[in-house]
Amino acid sequence: MDILERTFKKLTRLKDNLQDLSQEEAYEVFRAILEGKLSDIKTTAFLTAMRIKGETSEELLGVIKAIKERMNFPQKKEDALDLGLNYDGKNRTIYILPSALWLCSRLGVEFTNHYALGAPTKEGVTLYEVVKELGVDMNVSFVDQKNYAPELYKLMPLRRELGFRSLINTVEKFLNPFQTKKIVVSIFHKPYFDKNAELLELLGIEDYTIIKGLEGGIEPLPDRPTLVKKRGKDIESIEPKSLGLEMPKDVHSENVLRDSLEINRKIIDGRERGEFFNWALYTAGVLLYAAGECESVEEGVGRVEKEST
């Protein structure tokens, strides 16, 4: 029995008897998927079984190794902060991240982001789309998944057809094609803090920050506490009221791209200095903290605010 047969046998049991895979087994299965050696039916079975079982950090690491072996790496940007955002974007709330990036860029902070358009399950608006339409330099480098990981990108139609968040939604945030030393990643649920921290340690990332933000992203929630975990520290609860800044009460949107462009253009042009500008300051403070440019979010907000006056 070869490793693929043995691995699938582990994943074709009843739910209570599903067995975790070794890092090597996860690597071999996903390598076979990327090489087109597994049918869509077997690929679907693998992704579904892993979804039901729940992935371990070792399994995710094996999948990442299989992907990275076949990646096309752009120019290395070791000192930048990689924005490991959920690839499926946003479909319910306004982006404030572009204004925050613009504010941080004035302090010389560099960012990277990798993305794919139309990624499941939300198939929402990506940061890239908003920044591209704004046409303003924010010191951020982008790379499309279809260019840096074409074999992975070929799975997109199957992922859309499946219609659920698979392990690919998790691992693609950690691929770090620009090979930065610093990463900030987003999560949807609090239990993922520990698993993501363990995975980042296994990947050897020198400095990482994990954020449970708006729509599972890295933007801090304007109306309630945001949970943040920095490497080597406990989970922090950042309360917007503690910053002494009035935040917007409602950031929902029926047209994310249109409304995001409108708000961010006003901030960048200097026409908005109210609640949304304050939210941009808050988000920029979080980014500076994640980039290791300050010791706390509060300090980061103060630095950005001083630069903006």
From Swiss-Prot:
Family assignment from sequence similarity: Belongs to the anthranilate phosphoribosyltransferase family.
> Which keywords accompany this UniProt record?
Glycosyltransferase, Transferase
Q: Which InterPro entries match?
A: Anthranilate_Pribosyl_Tfrase, Glycosyl_Trfase_fam3, Glycosyl_Trfase_fam3_N_dom, Glycosyl_Trfase_fam3_N_dom_sf, Nuc_phospho_transferase
Q: Does the keyword Transferase apply?
A: yes
Species of provenance: Aquifex aeolicus (strain VF5)
The record, for Pfam families, names:
Glycos_trans_3N, Glycos_transf_3
Q: Which GO terms describe its molecular function?
A: anthranilate phosphoribosyltransferase activity
Q: What is the lineage of its organism?
A: Bacteria, Pseudomonadati, Aquificota, Aquificia, Aquificales
Q: What is this protein called?
A: Uncharacterized protein aq_209
**One GO process term, biological-process aspect:** L-tryptophan biosynthetic process
Key word Transferase present: yes
Sorted alphabetically, the Gene Ontology cellular component annotations on this record are: cytosol
